[in-house]
Regions:
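N-terminal secretory/targeting leader peptides
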Residues: 2-122, 130-363
């Protein structure tokens, strides 16, 4: 309802201001946009989903609205997609917004918080729990409109050169990780380093870092991380849901006709569903291949997870005390998390835990 209401309000705004708007917004004339991403083309699920989204927009608008996608580094560096969208270098960009917590830590709610909402919960909060409205109000300050456009689901905990048997093993660990996850781990002695995707493998290979996380088995295999580190840990508690987002320059968004806006939002919603389905299909197969290649699967010890959980919520409380933006969104997020977890504990997790246990037994 809230998404539909947003589109209705946007359409009303277009009609009310048609006289003073560019001709494009009045006539539905052809539009050509450039889209910068943070992804290399080798990541065919992530970058490929962006390409498919662009094609879908064209289909929905009889080819009048064309968006051309570019891999990370082709127009701007992978970690500068936000800036390029904000300053109008490109009309839009596709990225993980937690790369930009240095601008405002509250942007992390868009991509997902450690020990927070899972993929389905994130989608529910964004679309029907008030999350999208709060995040759009935040991003508007930078002249950006965010549109959820994909989700990679829960992540793995990364590849490590050494085993992690205790909290002490985290101290001094040079770890490729971005976002609030890095801030949380720094409390436990980790040295977090935000490195672009294409630089992860060479950094791990030459020993510039001791460990690296990216997404999950399919993409991690694509990057070849298993060739330079053998211990593969789980779960990736820092992102139980990693939503990726289309950032749109607000001026360019406001210049679009209502039908083009609707097409773009519809294509992004479709991309979210299909991206999750692709990862859920491809990750199991990739995990089997990695294990067959000699990768050593390891679960983070419970004391390590407990320490990280404590540090995570201490970090959130500290940020809420310093940032009015963070506090406002955190209050909404916390309530939704508590309510949603109650339902998941009663139904989803009870059934899942039982069937997982039974599937591990001989029939």
């Amino acid at each position: 309802m809230q998404r539909r209401a947003f589109l209705m309000r946007a359409g009303a705004g277009v009609a009310a201001t048609a006289v003073g708007r560019p001709a494009i917004a009045q006539t539905g004339a052809p539009v050509r946009w450039r889209l910068a991403t943070s992804w290399p083309k080798s990541l065919d699920t992530l970058y490929g989903s962006v390409e498919a989204m662009c094609q879908r927009v064209g289909q929905l608008t009889d080819r009048k609205f064309q968006i051309q996608s570019f891999a990370g580094g082709e127009i701007v560096p992978p970690l500068q997609v936000w800036d390029a969208t904000q300053n109008g270098t490109v009309e839009c960009g596709h990225t993980l917004t937690s790369f930009n917590i240095g601008k405002n830590p509250a942007v992390a709610f868009d991509s997902g918080l450690a020990f927070g909402l899972n993929t389905r919960q994130q989608q529910a909060w964004m679309n029907y729990g008030g999350g999208l409205e709060l995040i759009r109000a935040l991003f508007k300050k930078d002249g950006i409109l965010p549109i959820p456009c994909g989700n990679v689901g829960v992540q793995m905990g990364g590849f490590y050169r050494k085993e992690i048997n205790s909290v002490d093993d985290l101290k001094g660990l040079k770890f490729r990780i971005g976002g609030l996850g890095g801030m949380i781990l720094a409390k436990l002695g980790v040295v977090p380093l935000q490195i672009p995707t294409a630089d992860i493998y060479p950094s791990l290979e030459r020993g510039a870092i001791d460990a690296a996380e990216w997404i999950g088995p399919y993409d991690d295999e694509k990057l070849g991380l298993h060739k330079v580190a053998k211990y593969y840990y789980y779960p990736g508690w820092w992102e139980g849901s990693a939503q990726v987002t289309l950032l749109v320059n607000l001026q360019h968004w406001e210049a679009l006709p209502e039908s083009y806006r609707a097409a773009l939002e519809a294509a992004c919603a479709e991309t979210t569903v299909l991206m999750m389905a692709k990862y859920d299909t491809r990750n199991p197969e990739a995990l089997r291949r990695l294990v067959a290649a000699g990768v050593q699967l390891r679960q983070f010890p419970r004391p390590v997870l407990d320490a990280c959980y404590k540090a995570a919520f201490e970090t959130y409380d500290e940020l809420a005390g310093r940032s009015a933006d963070f506090k406002l969104i955190y209050e909404s997020w916390q309530k939704f998390l508590a309510d949603s977890n109650l339902w998941f504990r009663v139904a989803e997790n009870t059934l899942d835990n039982y069937r997982f246990a039974m599937s591990a037994q001989p029939r």
